[in-house]
Each structure stands twice: as C-alpha cells, then as structure tokens.
Amino acid sequence: MDGKQKPDAVKQADVKQAGVKPAGVKPAGVEITEVARSLAAVRPSGNAARLIAEIRTLEDQKSALAARQARLSVAFDLLRRREQADAGMAAADLGAGAAAQIALARRESPAKGNRLLGLAKALATEMPHTLAALEAGQLNEWRATLLVRETAGLTAEDRAAVDEELAADTGTF
C-alpha cells in the first residue's frame, strides 16, 4: 500500500491476507512473555552439544517471531489505513504514523520504523517464500532484510520470481 489507494481499498480481506488471525483469537503475546520469563530463570547447563542445540532452537524461534512481527506490522498498517479512511483522512495521508508506532513497539527509532514496515510489506506481498523461510527458521531477519534490500530495484513481478527461484534451493536461504 503506497497511500494512494482510495479509502475503500483497505478491507478486512487485506488484514486476513497479511496472515493475522481475526479478532477474538487470544493473542500469543501472553504465552510468549511467559516462555521468555521461564527461559530467563533457567541456568545454562548440559554438554556442549546441548548448549549449541538450544542456541540453534532459540535462533529458529527468533526468526519465527520476526516473521510474526512482519505479519502483524502489515496488518496494523492496513487497519490504521482503514480507520483513517473511515475518519475521512485524505487518501494521500493514509497510513500516517503507523511506521512510527511500529518502531515504538519494537523499541526502534521512527526512521527505522519506516524500514521495518517496508520490509514487512515486501515480505508479505512480494516475497512470500522468503517470509515462509523466515517463519521456518531457514533464515534470520537480517538475511531476509538483505534479500529484500537487494531486490528493491526490481519490479514486483521480478522480485517475486527471484523469491520463487531462491525458494527452490532451500540451501540458498
């Protein structure tokens, strides 16, 4: 969404397409917080292989959480645009403030919020295989960022083709 769509262009279907569960579903944030607290209370122990295995598992979970943040960011942006359109905001101004709020939630600068939202939109709309690989822990958020950044000059169709080609070779991710 570039903010130039008509107000009726932001629909609930867009939020569903972003991969976020509909309203009424208990958010995972409570469970995630409980898991984080539990992990913080456990002292590292075990042999070297066990420690490395846990580090890998945690890295995979970080990737899955980054993918979830991307989906939530896209859904939030779409929801904000719809609310602003319903309030009569000019089409060119739709989405104002969304990236800054995402940045605040992620404890990042407002400028980085624009980059994070751009990354999320690219993954959700043009690079679904990269997003799926991120969710599966096949690559981390930084590597996903590099893929999005290096394909930024391509058309949406070409970017999607690169995404599909890279997905065929899971070792690439």
Tell where the protein language model's regions lie, with residue ranges.
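Peripheral, non-cofactor segments flanking catalytic/redox cores
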Residues: 1-173
